[in-house]
Amino acid sequence: MQNFLREREKWKNVRENPQYKPLLDALFEEYDRSCKDKEIPLITFSDEMDFTKTGDRTRFNKKYFLRRKQLSVYAILCMIYPENEEYLEKLQDVICAICNEYSWQISAHRSRIDRNKRDGLSLFSCETGLFLAEIKQMLIDRLDPLVIERITAEIDKRILKSFENSHNLWIETLKSNWAAVCGGSIGMTFMYESSERFYKVNDRINTFMNNYLDGISDDGGTSEGADYWNYGFCFYAMYFDTFSKYVRGNTAGLEKEKVRKMANFYSSIYLNDKNMVSFSDSSGVGEYHLWLMHFLKEKFDIVMPPKDGGWIDFEKFSAAVRAFLYYNPSNTADSIKSGKTYYEKLSWYIERKEKYGFAIKAGHNGEEHNHNDIGSFIVANKRKQILCDLGSAQYTAVNFGKDRYTIFNNSSLGHSVPIVNGSEQGTGKDFYGTLIVSDKISVDMKNAYPEKIEKLTRSVELKENGLAVTDEFSGIFEIKERLITKEKPVISDGKIILDGAALSYDGDWKLVCSDKVIKTHEGNNLTVFILDFMPKTKTEKFTLNIDF
């Protein structure tokens, strides 16, 4: 396979061409954060056991991923500044520390049954094998032979033999981002290490990739949300791009119509230049793998998303190194333009007006990285979401266990949807909604709740200077309309002011404002504000007007 990672002229251009300065700035900023005056973090037994005892993965993950950031930074610096022997020395130290890790799996991904299994295959163990294989290929002429021997032995034991000796692995049945990340990483690692062994497992790798595509809607959308599109599609594209170099031009995996549609998904779900749709376990902040968008621009001529969102993820060497190799300074990104996006199969509708952006979803409550959120909607001004979807909560054992929906972000209580007869929405595919797009946008929500409901329909009228959201219902003895926002509401002249937008509602409804402190995905405290509306008299309709 052509060793594209070692193209000396390309790396010379990165160093000397002033158009690459933003990338070099990002590299040295990460160096200052993760490497300068920092030792390789020691991962202790108590770090390993923290998740088992408390369900908190923060302490272990911080050290684990800092090591991978150091790995990426030093390896890339070695290519740009080959005369600096200190970078190579530091890199080899990090490589050996990673090779010494008891397992390449994070503690949260090791089951309680086989916690002593050192060669388990899950997201980050598969990634680690790939990172080391690519660094070995990239610096084969500079790494100490003992380091090369160690990398080869650990990859063989932890990735290649582990995969060859296991059949019908649980990860081979998944249809989420895991399929692309695990399958792509394993496949590329085999490519780098052994042609003969790769072709023996190629059919299994193709199963991973086909499973990943099966989890994508026919119109190219993913219910996992923007962040997991960015993750899974990154490894899908990376695998087939690497495969095309391996077999000299075979790009079949990238020529499928669904893949072409997928390529445009990310750019299509922006609400403004900084914010995206944050349904499911997403952040709502437009941050994308820089290399991926430049690759997709070259391959599919996609609409480039706002350049400020371009991100080099130094936790993932293979994505980080490609940012430097695939970056094209001539690719420019325009501001997000007004327009509509309708993913019928996914049941998402997004519309961008001059003054605001809007998104609403239906689907079902058994999706990947599911939230119970049928009928949930987002409204953003030109700066931020003012009626928000909170997106992903902090990842803990609870978040992926039987009590997932006790977490505010994940339950319907944490979304802008009604509470009906004192109940939140149900969990599972049996609880669903129907999105209808015509003159108005509407969601039939009556099947999203445990109790039988005659009628519960949310309709939205979008105008240039604002929108109206109307819920109509019958066969309900108690209803509480709920809105979620991160903005502290200001009540003025009977209106609710959220960052300049004016919300008005029917006078025969009573407003109760409260707040709640939740944990963000990063583990920080965040105060969110809950706007609850209760009818003063019997009614079968609630209308909310939002003016900009």
Regions found by a protein language model. Name each.
Residues 1-27, 65, 76-80:
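Extreme N-terminal leader/anchor segments
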Residues 31-44, 90-109, 147-169, 200-220, ...:
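Long, well-ordered core segments of solenoidal/helical folds
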Residues 69-82, 86, 127-144, 182-196, ...:
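Well-ordered alpha-helical scaffold segments within catalytic/enzyme domains
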Residues 112-227, 238, 325-337:
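Active-site lining segments of carbohydrate-active enzymes
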